[in-house]
Amino acid sequence: MAFALLRPVGAHVLYPDVRLLSEDEENRSESDASDQSFGCCEGLEAARRGPGPGSGRRASNGAGPVVVVRQRQAANARERDRTQSVNTAFTALRTLIPTEPVDRKLSKIETLRLASSYIAHLANVLLLGDAADDGQPCFRAAGGGKSAVPAADGRQPRSICTFCLSNQRKGGSRRDLGGSCLKVRGVAPLRGPRR
């Protein structure tokens, strides 16, 4: 027994004035309606539907795609502006974060992680004031190097932040570290009570 799959002739071919929606078109219309409630795709849906019943005239066949193209171009321009704005902000942030080597280009995620670390470092510099004369305020703030994992020789390994390590490599003291970090930003170090 052989079956032939016949494709029915669409109602829109036989009766162009009658608008029947298939199940897929109905589902698409429902999802488009939910998109419209968020202000999304309004022009695309309007172009696809054509003029409303109260418009009194029909749009020419070429007007719909032109509207869609203009809207797409406008959306692309907005996205380019947004991307350029984000990239400009990252460039500005990169100039504020000290890196080694100085000319190192950071990725966006590296920039965010290093900025977060640098903010924590500066907070430790501000909180400890002159109490951390060894140039490692983050080491001092972290509990003096107590770690759950002992070093191979039985001593506790020292945890140190990137910026304290950089200062240590340069041979600077706490005063150099705090002064340089804060002077670059135009902020004077806080003088807290000595312990």
Swiss-Prot record:
Loss of function: phenotype: Lethality within an hour of birth, possibly caused by rib defects that lead to respiratory distress. At birth, neonates display obvious caudal agenesis with tails that are shortened and curled. They also lack the normal cervical flexure of the vertebral column, and their hindlimbs are curved towards the midline. Neonates also display low-set ears, a thickened neck and loose skin. Defects are caused by impaired formation of somites: cells from the paraxial mesoderm are unable to form epithelia, preventing formation of somites.
| Tissue spec. comment | Expressed in heart and skeletal muscle. Specifically expressed in a subpopulation of embryonic stem cells (ESCs), that are still undifferentiated but primed for ifferentiation. Expressed in hematopoietic stem cells (HSCs).
Lyase as a keyword of this entry, yes or no, is no
Q: What does the record list as GO biological process?
A: anterior/posterior pattern specification; ear development; establishment of epithelial cell apical/basal polarity; mesenchymal to epithelial transition; muscle organ development; muscle organ morphogenesis; negative regulation of hematopoietic stem cell differentiation; neuromuscular process controlling posture
- Residue ranges annotated as compositionally biased, kind Low complexity, are 56-65
Q: Under which name does UniProt file this protein?
A: Transcription factor 15
Where primarily located?
Answer: nucleus
The places in or outside the cell where this protein is found are: Nucleus
Give residues where Phosphoserine occurs.
60
Determine if Protease is one of this entry's keywords: no
Role according to the record: Early transcription factor that plays a key role in somitogenesis, paraxial mesoderm development and regulation of stem cell pluripotency. Essential for the mesenchymal to epithelial transition associated with somite formation. Required for somite morphogenesis, thereby regulating patterning of the axial skeleton and skeletal muscles. Required for proper localization of somite epithelium markers during the mesenchymal to epithelial transition. Also plays a key role in regulation of stem cell pluripotency.
- Stretches that traverse the bilayer: none
**Domain bHLH residue range list:** 70-122
GO molecular function terms here?
Answer: bHLH transcription factor binding; DNA-binding transcription factor activity, RNA polymerase II-specific; E-box binding; protein dimerization activity
PANTHER family the record matches? BASIC HELIX-LOOP-HELIX TRANSCRIPTION FACTOR, TWIST, TRANSCRIPTION FACTOR 15
| Assembly, per entry | Heterodimer; efficient DNA binding requires dimerization with another bHLH protein, such as TCF3/E12. Interacts with MEOX2.
Q: Which residue intervals make up region (Disordered)? A: 44-65
Q: Please give an example of a GO cellular component term from this record.
A: nucleus
Annotated Pfam families: HLH (PF00010)
Q: Which residues form a coiled coil?
A: none
Key words, A-Z: Activator, Developmental protein, Differentiation, DNA-binding, Nucleus, Phosphoprotein, Transcription, Transcription regulation
Give the organism the record lists: Mus musculus (Mouse)
